[in-house]
């Protein structure tokens, strides 16, 4: 795959920006997808976004930094949007490389913004985990201090290391990792008599897999026992590996099961558009969960767990969340959505509105332009 891609051109761009990424994640890279969709939206607004990488893992730090010094010669008038996750810049979660790269760019006089895909340090257990967490918090603060602008993917008020009302930090939510959906996507399954479809994204590896499958079964079986014809779509990482456990869990339940594995974005979009609800049991639903944003973009009701985390503006979408671990409440919430077409359509409408006004890529691209031309606090 070409690691440097230009967004589609629509005439002569008025500005040229660079999205700078670290190590590529496998088998899919959500940050690269984010930059690609952002670039497509920016192109329609006159900004050409070029994607570049510091491939320190494949080439070693010395060679990767040398190539960066050569490539950055053409970036003098550009905004550099450095994409931060801890493991994109470090093998073991000590991302000093991100600071090194930012320092090189700043010493060359380039305008640099850091896009925080992980604006909070990852929590770790034990002595090493505690040191790693403290290290990441320090690096997060230093990246913010040394950059010209910080773009947070969570509301700034929820980030405890960030000074309140910091004028250099802005909140811009992530967008969906799928192509733009049709303007109208109704409740197709209910109209053509097919079973109602519940989409489930990803299944974690053991030891979490058994609990997740128990939660999924506990949520859908009561609705099936009430006579609702059901189909479950399993897609994403881990679903093929869990094929035997999934089939055993739903054997002789009368529920149709499809295990799709990893899907390219267009097929993922189509699968979501054909679904009637998205069920999320891999922890609490939170603002930076790309699957939830994709579900919102496709106008889906989202049923899942919640904790005390502030998830605004995702809370504006069609969510039915219950306390984390409350399996009976999860089953009731899903049954309500599947049984009541009026409720389902109301939740669909809320998700569609939230997508149009908050999570659509054209809205996000406009927010970037406003932030980088007239800095102001949005969180």
Each model region followed by its residue ranges:
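Acidic donor-binding loop of glycosyltransferase active sites
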Residues: 272-287, 300
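Short acidic/histidine- and often glycine-rich active-site loop of Leloir-type glycosyltransferases
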Residues: 297, 306-321
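A charged, aromatic-enriched C-terminal amphipathic alpha-helix characteristic of glycosyltransferases
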Residues: 30, 339-372
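Membrane-proximal helix-turn-helix segments that form the acceptor-binding/catalytic region
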Residues: 99-111, 130-150
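Conserved acidic donor-binding segment of nucleotide-sugar-dependent glycosyltransferases
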Residues: 316-328, 336-342
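Donor nucleotide-sugar binding/catalytic pocket of nucleotide-sugar-dependent glycosyltransferases
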Residues: 141-184, 191-193, 200-203
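Conserved catalytic-core segment of nucleotide-activated headgroup transferases in glycan assembly
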Residues: 190-246
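Nucleotide-activated donor-binding/catalytic signature segment of Leloir-type glycosyltransferases, i.e.
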Residues: 243-269
């Amino acid at each position: 795959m070409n690691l440097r891609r230009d967004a589609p051109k629509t005439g002569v761009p008025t500005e040229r920006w660079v999205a700078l990424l670290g190590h590529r994640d496998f088998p899919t890279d959500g940050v690269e997808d984010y930059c690609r969709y952002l670039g497509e939206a920016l192109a329609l607004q006159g900004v050409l976004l070029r994607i570049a990488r510091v491939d320190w893992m494949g080439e070693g730090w010395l060679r990767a930094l040398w190539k960066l010094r050569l490539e950055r010669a053409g970036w003098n008038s550009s905004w550099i949007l450095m994409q931060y996750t801890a493991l994109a810049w470090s093998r073991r979660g000590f991302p000093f490389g991100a600071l090194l790269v930012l320092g090189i760019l700043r010493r060359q006089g380039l305008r640099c913004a850091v896009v925080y895909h992980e604006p909070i340090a990852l929590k770790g257990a034990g002595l090493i985990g505690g040191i790693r967490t403290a290290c990441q918090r320090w690096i997060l603060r230093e990246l913010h201090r040394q950059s010209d602008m910080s773009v947070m993917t969570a509301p700034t008020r929820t980030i405890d290391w960030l000074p309140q009302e910091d004028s250099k930090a802005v909140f811009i939510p992530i967008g969906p990792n799928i192509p733009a959906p049709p303007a109208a996507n109704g409740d197709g399954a209910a109209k053509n008599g097919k079973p109602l479809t519940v989409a489930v994204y990803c299944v974690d590896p053991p030891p979490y897999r058994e609990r997740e499958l128990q939660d999924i079964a506990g949520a859908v079986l009561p609705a099936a026992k009430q006579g609702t014809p059901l189909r479950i779509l399993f897609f994403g990482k881990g679903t093929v590996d869990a094929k035997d456990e999934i089939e055993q869990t739903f054997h002789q339940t009368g529920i149709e099961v499809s295990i799709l594995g990893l899907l390219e974005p267009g097929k993922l979009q189509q699968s979501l558009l054909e679904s009637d609800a998205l069920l999320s049991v891999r922890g609490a639903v939170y603002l930076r969960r790309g699957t939830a944003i994709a579900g919102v973009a496709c106008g889906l009701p989202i049923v899942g767990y919640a904790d005390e985390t502030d998830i605004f503006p995702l809370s504006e979408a069609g969510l039915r969340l219950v306390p984390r671990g409350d399996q009976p409440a999860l089953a009731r919430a899903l049954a309500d959505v599947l049984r009541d077409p009026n409720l389902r359509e109301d939740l669909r409408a809320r998700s569609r509105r939230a997508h149009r006004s908050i999570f659509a890529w054209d809205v996000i691209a406009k927010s970037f332009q406003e932030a980088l031309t007239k800095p102001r606090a949005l969180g």
